A protein has these predicted regions:
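RNase H-like nuclease fold core
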Residues: 1-82, 86-94, 187, 206
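Short alpha-helical interface patches
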Residues: 4-6, 11, 57, 101-111, ...
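Generic recognition of cysteine residues
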Residues: 30-33, 100, 108, 159, ...
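Alpha-helix N-cap recognition
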Residues: 55, 100, 132-136
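Acidic/histidine-rich catalytic cores and adjacent linkers
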Residues: 75-85, 122-247
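Conserved beta-strand -> loop -> alpha-helix junction used to position metal-binding or nucleic-acid-contacting
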Residues: 76-82, 87-128
Length: 247
């Protein structure tokens, strides 16, 4: 019976009248990419794509299909991928877009590490880690005041340049620290939309956890053909949604 399932794939219908907060993220498996569009407030997958990479034209096409299907998207949460961001801004320019806070933290910490050597780096790490504690408008304002003070006191130091020996070319003396600072600075305009729009997820953690479960299941079923792998994922999406809808 298992093979019979994988020779075909399911279809399902979701009510389009309910306003939705959309999560968008992609994951790679077996040389392929799965992009999932999930209505997080409904705990339902409304669209997905099997592709080779996170292509902005394809994602924009998916979003236009979602819009034409009648879904009322009132907020979107994404990671920091440029392709996804460009597609969202093209199709839904006026819809609030939340940057995944965990992705921002992860990217910044990959530059300065968990154990920064300088006081400036340790202060920035403290700011980055404390993002997780923000719940209210007052929390946000307090965090921004600390961030602005850090910038005022350290931006010149962080962005210091020097000349290469025997050359007019310059480089950033503390490039890792600067990369973390620039990444955080660019994320801030879309980092606190979840406060202005209650219900909008501040992370894509739900999808990342879901992707982890899918990959665990695929490892248990090694040897499936490409078509059956894709159908396996479609059934997994379907049964996961059905289980959530019956709770």
């Amino acid at each position: 019976w298992f093979d019979e399932y994988l020779d075909e794939y399911p279809t399902w219908h979701i009510n389009t009248s309910t306003p939705i907060f959309l999560l968008i993220d992609g994951t790679y498996y077996c040389g392929h990419c799965l992009i999932v569009y999930r209505a997080e407030n409904l705990k339902r997958t409304i669209y997905y794509r099997f592709t080779r990479s996170e292509d902005d034209d394809e994602i924009a096409s998916d979003l236009m299909n979602i819009r034409s299907m009648g879904y009322n998207v009132i907020g979107i949460t994404t990671d920091g991928g440029d392709n996804i961001i460009r597609a969202v801004e093209y199709v839904y320019p006026d819809v609030p877009r939340q940057r995944c806070m965990v992705h921002v933290q992860r990217e910044c910490l990959s530059s300065i590490t968990l154990h920064p050597r300088t006081p400036e780096g340790r202060m920035l790490k403290s700011l980055i880690m404390s993002l997780s504690d923000i719940r209210t408008h007052n929390d946000m304002m307090w965090w921004l005041s600390r961030y602005n003070l850090w910038v005022e006191e350290n931006e010149e130091y962080v962005c210091e340049k020097a000349c290469l020996p025997n050359s007019t070319r310059t480089y950033f003396v503390r490039n890792d620290l600067r990369k973390a600072y620039v990444h955080l600075r660019r994320a801030i305009p879309n980092l606190f939309e979840f406060i202005k729009h209650p219900g909008l997820p501040k992370t894509t953690n739900a999808l990342e956890s879901f992707f982890g479960h899918i990959k665990d299941q695929l490892r248990l079923h090694r040897g499936l053909s490409e078509t059956r792998v894709d159908n396996f994922i479609k059934w997994y999406l379907y049964f996961n949604d059905e289980k959530k809808s019956k709770r």
